Amino acid sequence: RIHKRRAKKGFRKAQRLERIGKLPSIEDRPKEADKRKEIGHFEDDTIVSRQSLIRVKSINERASGVVFLGKMSDGTNKESTRVVCERLSSLPSSFRKTLTRDRGMENMGWTDIERALSLKVYFAHSYCSYERGSNENLNGLVRRFFPKKTNFAKVTDEEIRKVEYLLNTRPRKRFGGKTPLEVLLEKTG
C-alpha cells in the first residue's frame, strides 16, 4: 500500500508582545477570585470560527458560573473590548471586580476595559489555559451548541442569547443541582 504524502502545515509566526509592555499577572489577582466565594470575578475567552472572521466572546463569572456570550465582528482588540463592555456594563459596579484573560492580541485593549467598567484586568501566563479553567470548560459547553465547523456569520444574536440562557439555567453538579442564576441570586441577596 502506498501512502500519500502529507502537505506541510503552515505555521503562523509567534505574535510579539514585547511592544505592549508588562501585563498585569494572574499572580497579582486577589485570592478571593481563586476561592470562588465572592461575586464579581470574571474570565473571558474568544471562540473562533473556521468559516468566517466572526467570533464569539465567552465571559463567565467564577463564583456563580453565570455566562455572558457576545458576537464579535472580527478579532481586533477594539471589537473584543466593545463586546466585554457591552455585556458587563449592565451589572452593578459592585459586581465588577476582576477580569482574567489570555495574552491573545484581541485582549490588548485591557486598559479601556479597566476605565469603562472600573474593574482590574489580569492576564494568565502564556500557554497556561488551565489558569482560566472555568472559562475553558464553558467553551466546551458552548461548543456543544456550536461545533467546530459552525460558521458564526450564520448564527443570529437571538441564537447566541438562547444558548446563554440555556447555560445559565442548566443545573450544575458543583452547585448541588442549582443553576448559575439561582446561585447568583443567592449570593447577591
Where are the predicted features?
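Basic, flexible linker segments flanking DNA-binding modules
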Residues: 1-34
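Glycine-centered loop/turn motifs
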Residues: 36, 40, 149-150
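Two-metal-ion RNase H-like nuclease active-site motif
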Residues: 39-49
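Short conserved beta-strand segments at catalytic cores or DNA/RNA-binding microdomains
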Residues: 47, 51-68
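Active-site beta-loop-alpha junctions of metal-dependent nucleic acid enzymes
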Residues: 49-52, 69-93
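Short, surface-exposed connector motifs at secondary-structure boundaries
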Residues: 64-68, 91-96, 145-146
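Acidic/histidine-rich, metal-coordinating catalytic segments
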Residues: 94-109, 127
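Charged alpha-helix within mobile-element recombinases
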Residues: 104, 113-189
